[in-house]
Amino acid sequence: MIETDKLAAERIIAATPASSHEEAFERALRPRQLDEYVGQEKVRDQLEIFIEAAKRRAEALDHVLLFGPPGLGKTTLAHIIAREMGVNLRQTSGPVLERAGDLAALLTNLEANDVLFIDEIHRLSPVVEEILYPALEDYQIDIMIGEGPAARSVKLDLQPFTLVGATTRAGMLTNPLRDRFGIVARLEFYDAEQLSRIVRRSAALLNAQIDPAGALEIAKRSRGTPRIANRLLRRVRDYAEVKADGNITAAVADAALAMLDVDPVGFDLMDRKLLEAILHKFDGGPVGVDNLAAAIGEERDTIEDVLEPYLIQQGFLQRTPRGRVATLLTYRHFGLATPDAASPVRNLWDTPDAER
């Protein structure tokens, strides 16, 4: 049972898979072992120790919660955990588990020490989540048999297992669920050097010719996200084969990405549309996310989960109690004059001396 939600709008730099065909590509490019996994050194080192300890004790790994922006490798890590433990992986997602029976069917079919991966775990229904609590703590579930006065509760024992939960919104998890994870890991955006290594590895798997400068050019425009880097690589490879000699150089990558409307800092049309709306329609902000969503014709969740994290991390956008505000860096990026000292926007910036 494998299902994932898809964004309504397909973007070349979207951090979610756009199709089942693309998901198949991603699976082919995924690292299979921890020593192949690039980046996230702290998380990787921790998992290496915890997995080895669990294997030596011949017991299930403690439950793992992975959170962070989309496209950073949460699903990949879940597969690696199962492979390193030498056990089976069952994969599903929060929205798919609508009834308690759906989860019970999955849990009762797990073998000893298997891994159950639930993507978008923050979207579990309360009924399903209640069933999960005793399963995580005691490896038992309570199910109701019969109806009305004849109904009775039956306790079923489960094999020891590891739950790996993934979410882009850790804050939406209930405290009881969050507290039941023994291992909690946040995945961070990647730097250009790490992404360049990922691009070169993926190019080798795709039999694409690429030089280090070409890989770095793609990496710099990938928004710190491996999934986007691999997607851009495939499009640049197409361009290199048709418009050049097949070798991806910095010049070829630059031309291909310009054609795809991905600028030197990794912005595409939607990023620019969002920032320009704040600058021109709302005078630099502050503006509420609902007004912003209406102004650019995009879903609120897409703005919060896909567009904003990178813009905030790179310093182009600020969240304030009064709404979203464009930063000094945004004005400079679009070649606009910065607000004067009397502007209310300047008073909302985190840095008083931002113009320095």
Swiss-Prot record:
Disulphides: none
- Top enzyme category: hydrolase
Query: Which Gene Ontology cellular component terms are annotated?
Result: cytoplasm; Holliday junction resolvase complex
Q: Which InterPro entries does the protein's record reference?
A: AAA+_ATPase, AAA_lid_4, DNA_helicase_Holl-junc_RuvB, P-loop_NTPase, RuvB-like_N, RuvB_C, WH-like_DNA-bd_sf, WH_DNA-bd_sf
Q: Where does DNA bind?
A: R300, R319, R324
Annotated segments matching region Large ATPase domain (RuvB-L)? 4-190
Q: What is its EC number?
A: 3.6.4.-
Record-annotated residues binding ATP? L29, R30, G71, K74, T75, T76, E137, D138, Y139, R180, Y190, R227
Q: What is its main location?
A: cytoplasm
Instruction: Provide the function of this protein.
Output: The RuvA-RuvB-RuvC complex processes Holliday junction (HJ) DNA during genetic recombination and DNA repair, while the RuvA-RuvB complex plays an important role in the rescue of blocked DNA replication forks via replication fork reversal (RFR). RuvA specifically binds to HJ cruciform DNA, conferring on it an open structure. The RuvB hexamer acts as an ATP-dependent pump, pulling dsDNA into and through the RuvAB complex. RuvB forms 2 homohexamers on either side of HJ DNA bound by 1 or 2 RuvA tetramers; 4 subunits per hexamer contact DNA at a time.
Q: What is known of its domains?
A: Has 3 domains, the large (RuvB-L) and small ATPase (RuvB-S) domains and the C-terminal head (RuvB-H) domain. The head domain binds DNA, while the ATPase domains jointly bind ATP, ADP or are empty depending on the state of the subunit in the translocation cycle. During a single DNA translocation step the structure of each domain remains the same, but their relative positions change.
Protein name per its UniProtKB record? Holliday junction branch migration complex subunit RuvB
